[in-house]
UniProtKB/Swiss-Prot annotation:
GO annotation, biological process: regulation of transcription by RNA polymerase II
UniProt gene name: BHLH129
Sequence ranges assigned to domain bHLH in this UniProt record: 239-289
Region spans: Disordered: 1-145
PANTHER family assigned to the protein according to its UniProt record, in alphabetical order: TRANSCRIPTION FACTOR BHLH129, TRANSCRIPTION FACTOR BHLH83-RELATED
Disulfide-linked positions: none
Protein name: Transcription factor bHLH129
SMART domains: HLH
Biased composition (Low complexity): 68-82
InterPro entries according to UniProt: bHLH95_bHLH (IPR045239), bHLH_dom (IPR011598), HLH_DNA-bd_sf (IPR036638), IND-like (IPR045843)
Cellular component, GO annotation: nucleus
Gene Ontology MF term list: DNA-binding transcription factor activity, RNA polymerase II-specific; protein dimerization activity; RNA polymerase II cis-regulatory region sequence-specific DNA binding
Compartment(s): Nucleus
Keywords: DNA-binding, Nucleus, Phosphoprotein, Transcription, Transcription regulation
Length: 297
């Protein structure tokens, strides 16, 4: 791929033939570009060196088949066979390419290369075209990307429009890509929603139910007893399952039964008295009964 030093020395002595050999050694004697066009053989003309010198706006030297802008430097010394990367100067696209102050559209052209012989001018190198324009040419209609109407969206938002629409399309009708797709979406502007929609949302959330099932549910909830007190739900008394709780409950049950019998036997015993007073009254009642039995001989 790198041309030898002998070919460069021959280029200074032999003229056009040596330049042709140098170009063939760098790019290859024959190339088959059947995907780009009809299969032809490459016959480079001797005017390649002059074309580079006459075109001052050329950015780098493009070799056939090279995807990047890295080319062979013809002004380099004969002792060096390295490749030099050349980038465009500052402000190159602003000066040499047309710009559109009102639009943001740009077009990307596919690389084109034609190789022919006979009366045709020399081979056109593979290159990518980057153009910023807003014209209505046939090339832009097929290879240009549609602009996003940001200015129109901002103007519509200022005029009180609630939402703006943006669409992206790819309607290329060439042999490279026959598929077409269209994607569209809508963006709601913040703070521009109507008050009617908010009021309808609040009314739906806090208004009375409308369906029959909801009405029946509300009636069941409204039928609350007047004497009921809202309290925390708790377990009923006497339903503890722990063994100690069960034993204590049984003991209290036996004591309550005995006191009831004692209340039946002892007169003038108030039910609100304590257990100690009830036992004292029971003992006094028993002593009185014993004294009556002893008096009756």
């Amino acid at each position: 791929m790198y041309p030898p030093n002998s070919s460069k020395s021959t280029a200074h002595d032999g003229g056009g033939d040596a330049d042709t050999n140098q170009y063939d050694s760098a790019a290859g004697a024959t190339r088959d570009f059947s995907s780009l066009g009809p299969q032809t053989h490459h016959h480079p003309p001797p005017q390649r060196q002059q074309q580079h010198q006459q075109n001052p706006n050329l950015v780098g030297h493009y070799l056939p088949g090279e995807p990047s802008s890295i080319g062979f430097d013809s002004n380099a010394s004969s002792s060096s066979s390295l490749f030099r990367h050349r980038s465009s100067p500052a402000g190159f696209y602003d000066q040499h390419l047309p710009t559109d102050p009102n639009g943001t559209g740009f077009s990307l052209g596919r690389p084109n290369g034609g190789y022919g012989g006979g009366g045709e001018q020399g081979p056109s190198r593979l290159k990518s075209e980057l153009r910023f324009s807003s014209g209505s040419s046939s090339h832009q209609e097929h290879n240009s990307l549609p602009r996003i109407s940001e200015v129109e969206a901002a103007a519509a938002a200022r005029n009180g429009v609630a939402s703006s629409s943006m669409s992206f399309g790819n309607n290329r009708t060439n042999n490279w890509d026959n598929s077409s797709s269209h994607i569209s979406f809508t963006i709601d502007q913040p703070g521009k929603r109507s008050k009617n929609s908010d009021f309808f949302t609040l009314e739906t959330q806090y208004s009375m139910p409308q369906t029959t099932l909801e009405m029946a549910t509300m009636e069941n909830l409204m039928n609350i007893p007047e004497d009921s007190v809202p309290c925390r739900a708790r377990a009923k008394r006497g339903f503890a399952t722990h063994p100690r709780s069960i034993a204590e409950r049984e003991r209290r049950t036996r004591i309550s039964g005995k006191l009831k019998k004692l209340q039946e036997l002892v007169p003038n015993m108030d039910k609100q008295t304590s257990y100690a007073d009830m036992l004292d009254l029971a003992v006094e009642h028993i002593k009185g009964l014993q004294h009556q039995v002893e008096v009756r001989p």
